[in-house]
Amino acid sequence: MTAKKWFQLSEEGAGKLRLQALKFMFDKLGEFPVRIIAFFVVLSVFLQAKDRRNASLKFFKIINKKHLLLSAYRQFLNYGNSLVDKFLSVMGKLDPQKFELPEEDIFKSAFFITTHVGNVEIMRSLFQLKNKFEPKRVNIFLQANACKIFNDFLKTLELHIPEIEAFPVEEISPHTSIEISDRIQNGEIVFMAGDRISAQNENIAYEAEFLNHKVKFPLGTLKFALMLNVPVYFIVCVKDRKKYKIFAEKFVSDKQKRTEKLEDLKLQYVNFLEKYTLMYPEQFFNFYDMWE
């Protein structure tokens, strides 16, 4: 039987009623009970979500990790805690002082290609710090159907962060490209994931060596980044003990032709992804079979 793509997997454990209960518990009792709830929800998902569990076990086998089942469960648990952190971030209750930033000031006029290592979405807490960052708009491209239940629930909170605007990645058009280019020129920044192929563009992909296996990655993100002709960075935000560490690397190429630059971009991005996947394997939140 062919393994499911990530966009074909249902969102076990993320029902609207559960999230409403989560908010109720958070409002009444605080963060610690929410973490306890997350533990049991993750345990339920781990036991019931066979496709996700098998994909996780396969990943840890590929990287020669010992204690496969324990590593897989820790990966699930880390993901559950990352959702709680995301929840706290949107509620404005995640302490921005818990972040360790890159030494270089990179958060201006740039295009960031993200990964599903760690939890880059919680960086929204940083951009609410007016004394640390100049007011600017952050533009995020998301899969329209990614974590739909969770995102719909966040909308019911009626929280609006004017500095952040989300775009559906499936709806990129020439008009979008012009608008985003103008925004970056005005000091805004853009985030877009580079490690998941969308349902609409499943055939627009390139194949690369990742963890000694051939894996397909989306080509659209890389082409879009080059087309804008702005500084491009690869970025992850991972939890290390009680702090979130942000690692970023700038894309550099001396090639003149766009096709040659694209090849450099493919190589450097996959190398970056592999590096931090191996450093933080239990925060590699791709719960589907990339290696089918």
Q: Where on the chain are the PLM-derived regions?
A:
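Short, contiguous strand/loop micro-motifs
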Residues: 9, 43-44, 141, 167, ...
